[in-house]
Swiss-Prot record:
Record gene name: guaA
GO cellular component, one term: cytosol
InterPro entries registered for this protein in UniProt: Class_I_gatase-like, GATASE, GMP_synth_C, GMP_synth_GATase, GMP_synthase, GMPS_ATP_PPase_dom, Rossmann-like_a/b/a_fold
Gene source species: Synechococcus sp. (strain ATCC 27144 / PCC 6301 / SAUG 1402/1)
One MF annotation (Gene Ontology) recorded for this entry: GMP synthase activity
Protein name: GMP synthase [glutamine-hydrolyzing]
PROSITE patterns, sorted: GATASE_TYPE_1 (PS51273), GMPS_ATP_PPASE (PS51553)
Enzyme class: ligase
Recorded catalytic activity of this chain's protein: XMP + L-glutamine + ATP + H2O = GMP + L-glutamate + AMP + diphosphate + 2 H(+)
Cited Pfam families: GATase, GMP_synt_C
Assembly behavior: Homodimer.
Length: 534
């Protein structure tokens, strides 16, 4: 997404007369998290490039501006800077980490290398408990990640808080409503970080909590009807929370003008294709075209062991099937995609190479592998969820009546079980893994742990091990259990699952799944590992 289209998207929101805050992104890994935290206060927020000008910001009429952190130092030759006219807009500004340092430098203060960098948790000593720090307890733990610090505050600024290593941990110009914090209130490690964010949103920016699931659904339905009119829309349905929520939303907006296509490539978990058709076709009367393509996909993977080659072949075959079936079922004017706001942020290329100052483009993942369709099948896009984060999609799904089993569904990779079978994928291995995975899901649910894990699944290894069953030697496959805890999937810890749960799962798998004689538990976090094995 270019800066121009990024602005166009933001102007669409501004045209709705919705209160919003904007985050100017200087390349921080936490910019998206800041936006999510503001949304949690029921106030809309958008992440924009730091290159957004003061005039462009004025067009958006935001209630407040947040300057994100970033990997640079403000005195680097290629350090990203915001338009200095921002300080003359009369809009409250909160600078976070690098954003605070940039504020200080542009307003006449001094930033320099800290005598000692501060990384991790630090206790906040509060010097002025009013305004920004209301309800933030003295000694609160805040998350630090900086090697520079403010040496001299600009004229008009006062000290709000410090830590043992950071003399200026929070500062303010109360008259102009400019605030800066050296720590990251948006991360979960900052104990009272949300209290600070709420103070800025409600008390300093004077926002009202108007960003709700109900208002989004109403606006989205109006937008869909206005855009689509009486034309037909095609949606590739996977059964995940994103495409399912999108299907429910589109069906409520345009009814039978929507056609859902479910391509069963043979790599879903046991019972999922049947359950999907039951939920959509039978229970909710949302028409789904079921495309049975299992043999085609399995043939394409014959003899293939490289994980990237498996992904490519699955993607290419998906496009071929989608092309054939959309021609058969069409014509369609629109293709609905479940693009989410993180995808929009990723494509905005706001990262900066500190050595060259060049923009670092970020490749956006293709959605459902429909990005390579031929030109005569280039549909117009409908992307009603493009302003939502994943947790907001779940809330919308619930409000639309989506079954809880889909709303709370653990993330499942597009290539499905094909990348949870290491090495070549065969019909025999798929059956083994489906049976093992079903036991994992059954026991995790039965014992009440499903919501405790980000993901909990089984992996089939391409080796065999010796075992003994009924006084006889066995030589069969080992299954790996992979349970992880995470907030967003970007990082993850291996879950300390109860031994009783693991024992029950292990006993059931070796006794009930033919071809398996050993179960092991993966205790690798991400990083250095990844959540999926392939």
């Amino acid at each position: 997404m270019t800066l121009q289209t990024e602005m166009e998207a933001a102007l669409e929101v501004a045209a709705l007369n919705r209160e919003m805050l904007i985050i100017l992104d200087f390349g921080s890994q936490y910019s998206e998290l800041i936006a999510r935290r503001i949304r949690e206060t029921q106030v809309y927020s958008e992440v924009l490039s730091y290159r957004t000008t003061a005039d462009q910001i004025r067009q958006l009429s935001p209630k407040g501006i947040i300057l994100s952190g970033g990997p640079n130092s403000v005195y680097d030759d290629y350090a990203p800077v915001c338009d200095p006219e921002i300080w003359n807009l009369g809009i409250p500004v909160l600078g976070v980490c690098y954003g605070m340092q940039l504020m200080v430098q542009q307003l006449g203060g001094q930033v320099d290398r800290a005598e000692r960098g501060e990384y991790g948790k630090a206790a906040l000593v509060i010097d002025d408990p009013t305004d920004l720090l209301t309800n933030v307890e003295p000694g609160s733990t805040m998350w630090m990640s900086h090697g520079d610090s403010v040496k001299t505050m600009p004229e008009g600024f006062e000290l709000l808080a410090h830590t043992d290593n950071t003399p200026c941990a929070a500062i303010a110009d109360h008259q102009r409503k400019f605030y800066g914090v050296q720590f990251h209130p948006e991360v979960v490690h900052s104990v009272h970080g949300m209290a600070l964010i709420r103070n800025f949103v409600y008390h300093i920016c004077d926002c009202e909590p108007t960003w709700t699931t109900e208002t989004f659904v109403e606006e989205a339905i109006r937008e869909i009807r206005a855009r689509v009119g009486d034309k037909r829309v095609l949606l590739a349905l996977s059964g995940g929370v994103d495409s399912s929520t999108l299907a429910f939303l589109l069906h409520r907006a345009i009814g039978d003008q929507l056609t859902c296509m479910f391509i069963d490539q043979g790599f879903m978990r046991k019972g999922e294709p049947e359950r999907l058709m039951e939920v959509f076709n039978e229970k909710f009367k949302i028409h789904v075209e079921y495309i049975q393509a299992r043999d085609r996909f399995l043939q394409r993977l014959e003899g293939i062991t490289d994980p990237e080659e498996k992904r490519k072949r699955i993607g290419h075959e998906f496009i071929r099937v989608f092309e054939e079936e959309s021609r058969r079922l069409g014509p369609f004017d629109y293709l609905a995609q479940g693009t989410l706001y993180p995808d929009v942020i990723e494509s905005a290329d706001t990262n900066v190479d500190p050595k060259t100052g060049e923009r670092v483009a970020v490749k956006i993942k293709s959605h459902h592998n429909v990005g390579g369709l031929p030109k005569d099948l280039q549909f117009k896009l409908v992307e009603p969820l493009r302003r939502l984060f994943k947790d907001e999609v779940r809330q919308v799904g619930r409000s639309l009546g989506l079954p809880e089993e889909i709303v709370k569904r653990h993330p499942f990779p597009g290539p499905g079980l094909a990348i949870r079978i290491l090495g070549e994928v065969t019909a025999e291995k798929l059956n083994i893994l489906r049976d093992a995975d079903l036991i994992v899901r059954q026991e995790v649910n039965r014992q009440g742990y499903y919501d405790e894990f980000w993901q909990a699944f089984a992996v089939l290894l391409p080796v065999k091990s010796v075992g003994v069953m009924g006084d006889k030697r066995t030589y069969a496959y080992p299954v790996v259990l992979r349970f992880v805890s995470s907030e967003d999937g970007m990082t993850a810890d291996w879950s300390r699952a109860p031994y009783d749960l693991l024992e029950t799962i292990s006993n059931r798998i070796v006794n009930e799944v033919k071809g398996v004689n050993r179960v092991v538990y993966d205790i690798t976090s991400k990083p250095p590992g990844t959540i999926e094995w392939e």
